[in-house]
Every structure is written in C-alpha cells, then in structure tokens.
From Swiss-Prot:
It is found in: Cytoplasm; Nucleus. It comes from the Eukaryota. It comes from Schizosaccharomyces pombe (strain 972 / ATCC 24843) (Fission yeast). This is Uncharacterized protein C24B10.03. GO terms for cellular component: cytoplasm; cytosol; nucleus.
C-alpha cells in the first residue's frame, strides 16, 4: 500500500479529508496540519541552530574585543623610516613574541577558571 492508496481508502470509507503517511524525504514540504510530530522536530532543530548562531555571534564579539585589547596593548610609537626597514626575521620574532604572550594570557585565564570551578565544587561538597 503506497501513500496514494492510503488516501483513496479514506475517501472510500467516507472520510472528507484524506490523510497520507508522511515520508522523511518530503516531510518539510507537507502542510503544517499533516506534519504532526515532524513540526515539533523541525522547531527543535531550528531552535538548536538559532542557539548555535547566537553562540557563534557572541564568540565572534568576544574574539574581536580580545583582538582589539591585544592591539591596544601592543601599540608602538611612530618609528622613523630607517627603523621601518627591519629584516623579516625581527618581524617574525615580534609576531612570535606576541603570539606567545597571548598564549600565556589564555593559559593563565584557563587556570584561573579551573581554580574557580574547583572552589565551587568544594563549596558544593561542603554544603551537600
């Protein structure tokens, strides 16, 4: 019995609105009243996607703020034209130093967060 036979059988029995089973390949194209539980699944998936998009947006904002703070900390005074002709090795060394500094800051931040989590767990253990 395919979907068309199912609808014909309902019409033969006197039902006014033929109901067809919904197959996964075309459930998004069905009418809302025919989708039944698939509407709920679609709504949950949309909500998950929206949550991920919001998280992504917030993380991008945080990243931009951290980058701007890093740039503001590393602002250097104007140098003469002769000093601008540095070798590529010294520029690479400076970039490595900046990356290493940023890595150290992130490591310190992670260790602080880990300590806070550990302290919170200790407090919860004491209360429980």
């Amino acid at each position: 019995m395919d979907a068309d036979d199912f609808g014909k059988k309902d019409l033969e029995n006197g039902n006014e609105s033929p109901k067809k089973p919904i197959f996964m390949k075309d459930w998004k194209n069905s009418q809302p009243n025919e989708q039944g539980r698939w509407l709920h699944l679609d709504a949950r998936m949309n909500r998950n996607i929206e949550d991920l998009e919001i998280s992504n947006y917030n993380l991008r904002l945080m990243n931009e703020q951290l980058e701007s703070q890093l740039l503001s900390l590393n602002v250097k005074p104007v140098v003469s034209f002769a000093e601008q002709g540095k070798s590529s090795e010294s520029k690479t060394d400076e970039e490595g130093f900046i990356l290493n500094s940023a890595s150290n800051v992130l490591d310190n931040f992670i260790s602080i967060v880990n300590e806070l989590v550990q302290h919170a767990e200790d407090v919860l253990d004491d209360l429980g």
